[in-house]
UniProtKB/Swiss-Prot annotation:
Phylogenetic placement of the source organism: Bacteria, Pseudomonadati, Chlamydiota, Chlamydiia, Chlamydiales
InterPro entries: Cpn60/GroEL, Cpn60/GroEL/TCP-1, GroEL-like_apical_dom_sf, GROEL-like_equatorial_sf, TCP-1-like_intermed_sf
Assembly: Forms a cylinder of 14 subunits composed of two heptameric rings stacked back-to-back. Interacts with the co-chaperonin GroES.
Gene encoding the protein: groEL2
Function: Together with its co-chaperonin GroES, plays an essential role in assisting protein folding. The GroEL-GroES system forms a nano-cage that allows encapsulation of the non-native substrate proteins and provides a physical environment optimized to promote and accelerate protein folding.
The EC number(s) this enzyme carries: 5.6.1.7
The protein, known as: Chaperonin GroEL 2
Reaction(s) this enzyme catalyzes, per UniProt: ATP + H2O + a folded polypeptide = ADP + phosphate + an unfolded polypeptide
Keyword Acyltransferase recorded: no
GO biological processes: protein refolding
Molecular function via GO: ATP binding; ATP-dependent protein folding chaperone; isomerase activity
Record-linked Pfam families: Cpn60_TCP1 (PF00118)
Species of origin: Chlamydia pneumoniae
Amino acid sequence: MVWVFKSQFEGLSALKRGVHALTKAVTPAFGPRGYNVVIKKGKAPIVLTKNGIRIAKEIILQDAFESLGVKLAKEALLKVVEQTGDGSTTALVVIDALFTQGLKGIAAGLDPQEIKAGILLSVEMVYQQLQRQAIELQSPKDVLHVAMVAANHDVTLGTVVATVISQADLKGVFSSKDSGISKTRGLGKRVKSGYLSPYFVTRPETMDVVWEEALVLILSHSLVSLSEELIRYLELISEQNTHPLVIIAEDFDQNVLRTLILNKLRNGLPVCAVKAPGSRELRQVVLEDLAILTGATLIGQESENCEIPVSLDVLGRVKQVMITKETFTFLEGGGDAEIIQARKQELCLAIAGSTSESECQELEERLAIFIGSIPQVQITADTDTEQRERQFQLESALRATKAAMKGGIVPGGGVAFLRAAHAIEVPANLSSGMTFGFETLLQAVRTPLKVLAQNCGRSSEEVIHTILSHENPRFGYNGMTDTFEDLVDAGICDPLIVTTSSLKCAVSVSCLLLTSSFFISSRTKT
């Protein structure tokens, strides 16, 4: 292993090349007329996608410093998607524009810290302008428009999202049993406790664990060590090639967690550790509820040192499992129907007889797990590749549409950014470096509209001129129909939260890059 060092401008130039290479790979898929990108990695199935984050994740460069630029940009995109479900490509084109122009300022002798200060001052004014443009969703039609844009203008997926988005506590759980796309209400059960380590995830693009079916081991005590019984138990699961295993316990010692992670990563053991849900006072009864729902035997009620029976009989079973950082959701449990019904009646009677508001709320939360309120969305397509892509689109659209319902919408197609930048004047009392940074941000936020117009075969400057010549703040270019019109009326709109989050992450990583002064990386000797 040898260490490689680069000075400020040399290193920044290499990082810029990496960011620009990533942008060139992602932007052809941007907008309603963007192209699909084909991804083939090793023996994995072929993926055809227009999703920016899925494309970006596959870009790896040989040069260590160019690769560092790619990695930093990817982290920003992942943060945008994690927060809102959309906006990754918008963030990337703004990063590329900010970094490229900012580097020109540094080359001209301007202070990077002053450039950063100008960018930060400018972006705060852009946020204020975006807030003024925000429109609250007023009708199901508004929700449908947002959902369709978030689903890459797929009418079917957008309609499904709009249909189920109003249901409380929504999270898609996916199946491929039936043809087409359909939803079924009231099947999903959810508890508010998720995986204890991101190393358990099976789908890095959405940072969750998804299995068609799984076994469940429920322990009422903390797992402080891997006893011989538990090791033999894990070996039994592996040898018999059964379903994946979810282990739910009061807590997990770090050494135990590390061992489970290593077994998953090195030996392919499909396992996930989940901390027992509920407050400390309620944890025991919530675990009993889960045991009833899944058909598991609750182990360790009497003593923390009790042995775990080396048998599959004590395991519960669940179907259509989705585990995120915060929740554990499943569609069907293997519990006895009569026992489940008896528990539901017991909880209903307890609620009716409770005189304590807090106790009543706790009982209602427990009852909600039994009743279930998570819609099942079933997706199939002609090929597995298409099915995976549509499933990913649907999940992203769900998150983005929920974001729109919280914060409202702004005109889409990059118009909100354009109008915001056009309404802002550069303050007169700034230094040359701050002025440069201020203007750089105002130009960078125009880039998403420019890229979209170019992907639709239009001159970006002509499109911008036409838009700004109209006073209607919602007037813009509709790439779907290749016309200029009121974008909100046409259903071309973006969630405000997605718009601001993409800009926030873009500014954050760009300022980090521009103010870096020395670069160190390693590479293997050849």
